[in-house]
Amino acid sequence: MKKLLLTLVAFCAAFTAAAQTPDTTAAEGYRFTDVKLIPMTPVKDQSRSGTCWCYSTLSFLEGEILRAGGAPVHLSEMWIVRHTFMEKAVKYIRMHGEINFAEGGASRDVTEGIRNYGIVPFEAYPGFNYGTEKADFHELSRVLKAYLDAVMEASTKSSNKPLSTAWKRGFNAILDEYFGPMPETFTYQGKEYTPQTFAASLPIDIDDYIDISSFTHHPFYTQFIIEVPDNWMWGTVYNLPLDEMMAVVDNALENGYPVAWGTDVSEKGFSRTKAIGIVPAADLEGMGGTEAERWGKLTQKEKDDALYKFDKPGKELDITQEMRQVAFDNYETTDDHGMVIMGTATDQAGNHYYKVQNSWDVRPPYDGFWYFSRPFVAYKTTSVMVNKHAL
C-alpha cells in the first residue's frame, strides 16, 4: 500500500511539473502594442446590412467631432441610408436599370447626404421600423429592387407608356414603412432642431473632406471617377502616387485625424477570427537550401496553408504601384468594405500596423477593432477620406 501511495505521489508530481512546463510548440500569435490612438465613439453594428460605407463614415465624422472639441454623438446611419436609397432609385430609373442598385455605397454618399438633407442623432431616427433592434436588409433590399424593376417593366418602349407620376411617391411610401417617417423637427438634449440646424451645430465642415486614391490608369495629381460598382454617385477621388497616399494616411494619424478607409477584405490575408489583415510572403532568404527546395515543390494550396496560419508575425510582400494596379484591374481588389483607421500599433517583432475600428459590433479578440499591416493597407486600399487640413 505504501509503495502504491509513493508511486501515485510521484506520478502526480510528474504530471504537475509537465502541466507547468511551457508548451514550446504552441502558436506564438500576434501581440500588438498600440502606439497612437485617436479618440472615437463606441463601435457600432451594421448587422445584416451592406451599409459599412455609412457606419464607417459616420464613425469617422463622429471622431472628427471629438477631435474638434465637440461632445460625443451617435449620428443616425439610417437617416443617410434612407435618403441614399431614394437618390439611388432616381438614378437607377434614369439609367434604365443599367447601374448598380444595391446596399453598398461610398464615403462621399454620407458627406453629400449631410450637405443635402442635414443629419439627426440616432435617438431621433433609429430607422428600424420592421420589428428588429438592428439593421436587417435581407427583405428590404429585395423589395426595393423589385419595385423599381416593375416600374421600368411597365414603361418599356414596347408598351409606349411614360413613367407614371406616382412611382417616387410609391417608393417613398416603402421607405416610410421600413425606416419610419422622417421627422421635420426633433428635440435633442433639451433643444429643438431641424436636420439642417443640427448639422450646422456640429463643429465640422463637410467641405473639409476629400477622397484620395492611387491608381495608374489615370494621371497622377488629377481627379477621376473611381470605377467601382458601389460608386453609383460617380464621385471623384484625387489620384496620388502610392507613397504619397500612404504619407497622407500617416500624416493624418500623426496629427490626430482619423481616416475613413475603403478597402477589400475578401482576401486570404484577412482573418475574421484573428482580427488582422496581412500580406504574407515566403521568407526564401531565411530558408536553408533543403528547406527552400522543399518549398518550391509545394502546391499553391500547401503554400497558402503555410503562409496564412496567422500564428506569428512573418515576412510580408513589398507592395508596389504596379501590384496595386494589377490587383485592381483583374478584380483581385474590389470595393467591399469600409472602416476607420484610428491609430497605429506594432507587433512583437516591431512591424508597423494600423489600428482600425470596424462596424461588426464589439467582438473578440480586440473588442471590435482590427489590426492591418502596412503592406495590406498599401495593397488593398481603394480610397481614403481625410480632412484636407490633415494634408
Question: Which ranges hold each PLM region?
Answer:
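Residue-level detector of alpha-helical recognition elements and their boundaries
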Residues: 4, 9-10, 67, 95, ...
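A broadly tuned, weak detector of single residues within folded domains
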Residues: 6-7, 12, 45, 107, ...
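Active-site signature of cysteine proteases
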Residues: 21-22, 165, 169-391
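Active-site nucleophile-adjacent alpha helix/oxyanion-hole segment immediately C-terminal to the catalytic cysteine
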Residues: 27-231, 235-260, 354, 364-366
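Long, low-complexity, compositionally biased intrinsically disordered regions
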Residues: 20-28
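Bacterial Sec-dependent N-terminal signal peptides
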Residues: 1-21
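Extended low-complexity acidic/polar segments
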Residues: 1, 19, 98, 106-107, ...
